[in-house]
Structures are given as structure tokens and as C-alpha cells.
């Protein structure tokens, strides 16, 4: 079983495990899933076939989170859209499909990214999202669990300074026993650190510290969905923008470059090769290029090419097939990007640095896609949220176990 770090409340609500096989026909499009012996097979559920409602009528679905909102042990998911209301909704599994509930019924213009933790320390998970290039806001929403007839109260974390906040991460990065929030602020060209106030319900916006800045035109973005301890010193580290940042004390962090060419990418981190430091994966999310994984050889980061991807704006490391070895999950956005040729890839690892490439989906774009146990059966499913390809829409690929036979992918 995967050695899982705990979530932001100290629980392991994001599971990793086992797996099935299927060919599914959807209206107007036939989707086939690959077939390598030993790969996981998937069955598709979709808003197109009535398995869940669409988020709203807008066509720019930006952000996506997977977390257990109602504490029932099944991962729920959150989707944000930036052109219409409701701007933020969440989905709960009902045994056959997913019901939609509203988090924010106003237009908020959320950017890609976001994260979650128990901000108000009441035992449930609250969510954090940043505004896109149209504004300078970062917000948090108070989870009303267990009474979802009550509204999610929205409060400011940031409402001044530079615009655009593409990606946030939450973790105890200074090992003080309290989690911190870290956010890229692209138009300010800064990486911001926020300590959660003692009374976050009456405090806001929160004070912030600039822990890194840059002067070049190239933006920085990306964080792993699960933070890791890169240098094995017992502290979680901040990873993103082709770099990792080591805590030196107080609010001081040291920049360490993994690959300067991967500044504008999505990334993941995890133990792809057993023993030693965790590895890092970078995928060009808002452009085309080579997705790579990086391992520390004792002196420097050694790069290994996975493949050329077209706007690979989904990137995670998890044990998808439940064999005890970490796998790599990367998906192409579709629009902009490869359009109807968009693919979602999985590289199944053996724990020794060897990978078998597999295509989980071909024909539907995925943006900010996530892995989680979305039907409560104990394995990892795929949340396929597109940005603007065939939107508005949401798809879920349910993990059906390991294939026994192989067939050709079409």
C-alpha cells in the first residue's frame, strides 16, 4: 500500500490502491482506453450522460480540488468557473452519480489552483482559491459541515497587491506544528507565505511574507498536490516553478533549482524510486514541451524524459494500480492544446525508475485533473475536469481494477 502523507487536517482522505476495463460510447464521441497487460481499466461517468450536473453554463472551468468535505470517508470534489455564477460548486457521491451543491453563488473569477485545510480548526476542511489576472484576491470559504443548508462564508486572505494567483499549497513548511499557506502571485512576481491567524474568522486579510521573487518575464507556477520532504530533514518543503525551497528559520527560505527551464510548469513530487530523496515530475501545463521526471544523484538533479505533451496541465504522483510503487499521472488540456486528440497518460512505475506508459483517456481534455477515491471503494479514480474543451462538462473515470487481457488502443 502507498505510504501516504496525511491531508491538511491530519487525515488520509486521499486513498491510493487498485483497479478494471471497458470501452464506453458517449454521444458523438467514442472513447477507448488502453490496454497494456497489468494496467488499470476505467469506466467513464459524465455530465454528458447525466451522471452529474454541469458546474454552471460557463466555458472556463479553472480550478479543481478533491477532498472529503462532509467527513463521510468518500472524496468529494470542488470545481470553479470564472465567467458565470455559481463560481464555486462541490460534488457529493450518491451511490450512482454525483449531486452538485453550491459553495459560492456569485461570480468570483477563480484561477487554476487552490488548496484546502482546516483553517478555522473546527475539524472539517475549508477551501482556498485565488483570483485570476482580473484581480488581487485570495479567498477562503468556511465549511458549514455538517449542516450544508447553511452558506459557505467567504473571507479574504489577500485583497491588495498584484493580480493573478495561479496555484496554492498548504503544509507545515517551518515545522512549527501549524500549517502555512503559500501562493504564487504572478503579476507581482512573488511567492507569498501566509501564517493562518489565531482567529481566522475575524481576521483578514492575512499578513504575508515574500519568500521569493523574480525579475524575468517568465511566470512561475505549480505545486505538488501532496507536499514532500525533499532533503529528508524532517520538514515539508515547498516545490514549484522548477525549484524547491528549504526553510532556513523564521520566514526565510532558500531557493534550490531543479530545472530553470521548468519554471512555467505543473509539478508533482513523490517516491518514484524507493530509497533516498523523493523525485519530482514537471509537465508543461500552459505550453507544449517535454514532461520529465527528476531524481537526485547526490550532487545534482538528473532529468529523464517521459514524452512530449501538449499543454499537460494535470500532473500527479500516486500509486494508481495499488502495487506499492508510485505512478505518474499527466493529462493534456485539450483547449488550448491538442483538441480532440488530447490524451491522459499514466506511467506505471516499478519503484526502480522504470515506467510503462499507458493512455487512460483519448479524446477529452483534462485540466487541473485530480486523483481520489470518488466512489468510496478504496481505490484511486480520475477526476477529468476540462478547462474549455467541450465545456461545460465534468467526467469521472472510475477505477475498475487491473486488466487481465490486452487490446489495441484506437
Where are these regions (language model features)?
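Local alpha-helix boundary/kink/capping signal
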Residues: 11, 33-34
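Bacterial N-terminal signal peptides
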Residues: 22-32
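N-terminal secretory signal peptides that target proteins for export/translocation
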Residues: 1-18
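Sequence-pattern detector for short linear motifs
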Residues: 11, 20-21, 47, 388
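Beta-propeller-forming repeat regions
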Residues: 37-410
Amino acid at each position: 500500500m502507498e505510504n501516504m502523507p496525511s491531508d491538511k487536517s491530519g487525515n488520509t482522505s486521499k486513498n491510493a490502491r487498485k483497479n478494471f476495463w471497458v470501452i464506453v460510447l458517449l454521444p458523438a464521441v467514442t472513447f477507448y482506453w488502453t490496454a497494456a497487460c497489468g494496467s488499470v481499466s476505467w469506466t467513464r461517468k459524465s455530465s454528458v450522460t447525466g451522471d452529474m450536473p454541469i458546474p454552471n453554463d460557463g466555458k472556463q472551468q479553472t480550478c479543481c480540488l478533491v477532498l472529503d468535505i462532509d467527513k463521510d470517508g468518500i472524496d468529494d470534489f470542488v470545481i470553479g468557473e470564472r465567467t458565470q455564477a455559481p463560481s464555486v460548486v462541490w460534488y457529493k457521491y450518491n451511490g450512482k452519480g454525483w449531486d452538485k451543491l453550491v459553495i459560492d453563488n456569485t461570480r468570483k473569477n477563480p484561477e487554476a489552483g487552490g488548496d484546502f485545510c482546516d483553517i478555522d480548526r473546527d475539524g472539517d476542511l475549508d477551501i482556498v482559491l485565488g483570483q485570476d489576472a482580473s484581480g488581487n484576491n485570495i479567498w477562503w470559504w468556511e465549511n458549514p459541515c455538517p449542516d450544508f443548508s447553511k452558506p459557505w462564508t467567504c473571507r479574504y486572505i489577500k485583497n491588495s497587491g498584484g493580480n493573478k494567483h495561479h496555484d496554492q499549497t498548504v503544509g507545515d513548511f517551518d515545522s512549527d506544528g501549524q500549517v502555512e499557506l503559500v501562493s504564487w502571485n504572478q503579476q507581482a512576481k512573488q511567492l507569498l507565505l501566509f501564517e493562518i491567524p489565531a482567529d481566522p474568522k475575524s481576521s483578514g486579510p492575512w499578513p504575508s511574507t515574500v519568500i521569493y521573487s523574480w525579475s524575468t518575464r517568465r511566470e512561475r507556477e505549480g505545486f505538488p498536490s501532496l507536499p514532500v520532504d525533499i532533503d529528508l530533514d524532517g520538514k515539508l518543503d515547498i516545490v514549484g516553478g522548477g525549484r524547491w525551497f528549504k526553510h532556513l528559520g523564521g520566514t526565510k527560505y532558500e531557493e534550490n533549482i531543479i530545472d530553470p527551464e521548468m519554471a512555467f510548469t505543473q509539478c508533482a513530487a513523490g517516491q518514484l524510486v524507493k530509497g533516498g530523496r523523493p523525485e519530482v515530475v514537471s509537465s508543461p501545463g500552459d505550453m507544449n514541451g517535454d514532461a520529465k521526471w527528476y531524481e537526485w544523484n547526490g550532487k545534482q538533479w538528473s532529468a529523464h524524459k517521459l514524452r512530449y505533451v501538449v499543454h499537460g496541465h494535470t500532473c500527479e504522483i500516486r500509486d494508481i494500480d495499488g502495487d506499492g510503487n508510485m505512478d505518474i499521472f499527466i493529462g493534456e488540456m485539450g483547449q488550448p492544446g491538442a483538441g480532440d486528440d488530447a490524451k491522459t497518460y499514466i506511467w506505471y512505475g516499478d519503484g526502480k525508475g522504470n515506467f510503462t506508459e499507458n493512455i487512460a483517456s483519448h479524446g477529452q481534455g483534462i485540466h487541473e485533473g485530480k486523483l481520489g477515491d470518488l466512489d468510496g471503494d478504496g481505490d484511486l479514480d480520475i477526476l477529468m475536469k476540462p478547462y474549455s474543451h467541450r465545456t461545460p462538462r465534468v467526467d469521472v473515470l472510475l477505477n475498475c481494477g487491473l486488466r487481465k487481457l490486452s487490446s489495441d488502443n484506437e
